[in-house]
């Protein structure tokens, strides 16, 4: 009997010991579900904010990338000259097709609308309200030309801003028989003076030029920017024109 009792006690002690080890420790505390949820939400917010910042940076970089596909080209006039822009911005024609002054960036700025920029000078070809061509440091509405293919597959460039008031006839970019730049209102689209043949050299990507007001000048150090007319920049075959002179 005693042996049975002893073995029973031993069995009870062993069971008690096993139950003690199986019981979870008081020091082990379950973490609160709300606390876990808070940590999870915090991590998600951190991840989303990082993704958003990365997306904004990527979008800014994408905006800075060149978006417009244009061409570097020479413009051959049917009069027998290549259009050229001199270092001072004067425009005329030359028969020499090897000079860099005949290279132009043809940048699309609208549907069948282009900006014509000298590669060496960085100046835009512009046409003012009197039909004169002049070089512009800034891209303005006067620098926009409509590009149209004529019947003979030559291309004509007309001002997007100016035309004859009565007839509505467009004003065109043109060279005369001597290779001098003509007034836009004197150029007829049916004449060789207005007919150009682009001779592309390469395709290039361009950033969209910022549009400025007509007459706005490039600010210089210590000089207040003005919005006066661009009379000083007006050219006629490379010579300054007096605006007060009637045509």
From Swiss-Prot:
GO terms for molecular function: growth factor activity; heparin binding; sodium channel regulator activity. InterPro entries: Fibroblast_GF_fam, IL1/FGF. It is found in: Nucleus. Residues 15-25 have a biased composition (Basic and acidic residues). GO terms for cellular component: cytoplasm; nucleus. Keywords: Disease variant, Growth factor, Neurodegeneration, Nucleus, Spinocerebellar ataxia. Its main location: nucleus. SMART domains: FGF (SM00442). Gene3D superfamilies: 2.80.10.50. Nervous system. GO terms for biological process: cell-cell signaling; JNK cascade; nervous system development; neurogenesis; signal transduction. Residues 1-38, 214-247 are annotated as: Disordered. The keyword Transferase does not apply. It comes from the Eukaryota. Probably involved in nervous system development and function. PANTHER family: FIBROBLAST GROWTH FACTOR. Belongs to the heparin-binding growth factors family. Interacts with SCN8A. It is linked to Spinocerebellar ataxia 27A: A form of spinocerebellar ataxia, a clinically and genetically heterogeneous group of cerebellar disorders. Patients show progressive incoordination of gait and often poor coordination of hands, speech and eye movements, due to degeneration of the cerebellum with variable involvement of the brainstem and spinal cord. SCA27A is an autosomal dominant, slowly progressive form characterized by gait disturbances, ataxia with tremor, dysarthria, orofacial dyskinesia, gaze-evoked nystagmus, and learning disabilities. Spinocerebellar ataxia 27B, late-onset: A form of spinocerebellar ataxia, a clinically and genetically heterogeneous group of cerebellar disorders. Patients show progressive incoordination of gait and often poor coordination of hands, speech and eye movements, due to degeneration of the cerebellum with variable involvement of the brainstem and spinal cord. SCA27B is an autosomal dominant, slowly progressive form characterized by the onset of gait and appendicular ataxia in adulthood. This is Fibroblast growth factor 14.
């Amino acid at each position: 009997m005693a042996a049975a009792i002893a073995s029973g006690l031993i069995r009870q002690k062993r069971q008690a010991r096993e139950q003690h080890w199986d019981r979870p420790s008081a020091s082990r505390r379950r973490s609160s579900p709300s606390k876990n949820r808070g940590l999870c939400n915090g991590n998600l917010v951190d991840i989303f904010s990082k993704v958003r910042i990365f997306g904004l940076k990527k979008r800014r970089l994408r905006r800075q990338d060149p978006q417009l596909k244009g061409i570097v080209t020479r413009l051959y006039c049917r009069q027998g000259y290549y259009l050229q822009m001199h270092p001072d911005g004067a425009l005329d024609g030359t028969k020499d097709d090897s000079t860099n002054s005949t290279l132009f960036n043809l940048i699309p700025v609208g549907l069948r609308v282009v900006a014509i920029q000298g590669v060496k000078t960085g100046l835009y070809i512009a046409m003012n309200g009197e039909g004169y061509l002049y070089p512009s440091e800034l891209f303005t509405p006067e620098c926009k030309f409509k590009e149209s293919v004529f019947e003979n597959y030559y291309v004509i460039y007309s001002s997007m801003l100016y035309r004859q008031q009565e007839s509505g006839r467009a004003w065109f970019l043109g060279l005369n028989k001597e290779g001098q730049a003509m007034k836009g209102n004197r150029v007829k689209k049916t004449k060789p003076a207005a007919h150009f043949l682009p001779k592309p050299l390469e395709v290039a990507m361009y950033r969209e030029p910022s549009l400025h007001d007509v007459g706005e000048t490039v600010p210089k150090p210590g000089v207040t920017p003005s919005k006066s007319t661009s009379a000083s920049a007006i050219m006629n075959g490379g010579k300054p024109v007096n605006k007060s002179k009637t045509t």
